[in-house]
């Protein structure tokens, strides 16, 4: 625990205590300055005006603002590059997906044509004999589509 004096000393090293001390110091300095300026005015002396901001301070401020703006621009550029990358990846995925869907559609159509052709070629009469009409049509189609027979 400790004595009251020890507790008081411990409080001096806390953040809150230091903040209060700084605030007290600032208010004391402003009060003293105000009283001093008032006394000067009462005695008839010229009261010094507030010092204009020096060029160095302004240039430092301008440099800081320029750096902040530059940093913001760089950040915006990075964000834009990220957006473009995401957009490109999304477009690439959509393109791949569309190509895959197209391949699936083509293979289904090809399978359906094969099934239809097989069905036509395996048709039979009532007595079980194969029909020759569809077979002849199929051969004729093959001849028409083959490049060796057409010039």
Swiss-Prot record:
Keyword Lyase: no
Localization terms from the record: Nucleus, Nucleolus
Keyword vocabulary terms for this entry: Coiled coil, Nucleus, rRNA processing
Highest taxon of source: Eukaryota
Homology family: Belongs to the FYV7 family.
Note, other: Present with 1460 molecules/cell in log phase SD medium.
Name under which the protein is recorded: rRNA-processing protein FYV7
The species this protein was found in: Saccharomyces cerevisiae (strain ATCC 204508 / S288c) (Baker's yeast)
